[in-house]
Swiss-Prot record:
Its EC number is 3.6.1.23. This is Deoxyuridine 5'-triphosphate nucleotidohydrolase. This enzyme is involved in nucleotide metabolism: it produces dUMP, the immediate precursor of thymidine nucleotides and it decreases the intracellular concentration of dUTP so that uracil cannot be incorporated into DNA. Keywords: Hydrolase, Magnesium, Metal-binding, Nucleotide metabolism. The lineage of its organism: Bacteria, Pseudomonadati, Campylobacterota, Epsilonproteobacteria, Nautiliales. InterPro entries: dUTPase (IPR008181), dUTPase-like (IPR029054), dUTPase-like_sf (IPR036157), dUTPase_trimeric (IPR033704).
């Protein structure tokens, strides 16, 4: 699988896997940004992707930002479809009680390539019965 990346801004950083067995690669901010407590910000990367058909790129939080600072990806995982050609942006939220400063070139999220399966969608009058039925939201245990 090949991921083609175009710089939309010459100062953008091309991502790379940090270890031989890493599942994801880090995305970097193209700008300095301050996220106030409870605030959401859309952070640009200055990059556009050409993703092979049959795959998506999932945008996920960086565990260190979430654990140490309460900064996470709001719509996790965010999905970048293979036919999207615009700038890759990351929607971050600050769950902490303090403003958080993101510096230009700082790692803000990780991206993971995943296969896509499109289902054949069929409208039916009835669904098959199961032991679980319509039970949800904690119905299978305490």
């Amino acid at each position: 699988m090949k991921l083609k990346i175009k710089k939309l801004n010459q100062e953008a950083l091309i991502p790379a896997y940090q270890t031989k067995e890493a599942a994801g690669f880090d995305l970097h901010s193209i700008e300095d940004v301050i996220i106030k407590p409870g605030e959401r910000k859309l952070i640009g990367t200055g990059l556009a992707f050409e993703i092979e058909f049959g795959y998506e790129v999932q945008i996920r939080p960086r565990s260190g930002l979430a654990f140490k600072h309460g900064i996470t990806v709001l719509n996790t995982p965010g999905t970048i479809d293979s036919d999207y050609r615009g700038e890759i942006k990351v929607l971050l939220i600050n769950h902490s009680n303090e403003a958080f400063e993101i510096k230009k070139e700082e790692r803000i999220a990780q991206a993971v390539i995943a296969p896509v399966v499109q289902a054949e969608i069929i409208e039916v009058e009835e669904l098959s019965d199961t032991e679980r039925g319509a039970g949800g939201f904690g119905s299978t245990g305490k």
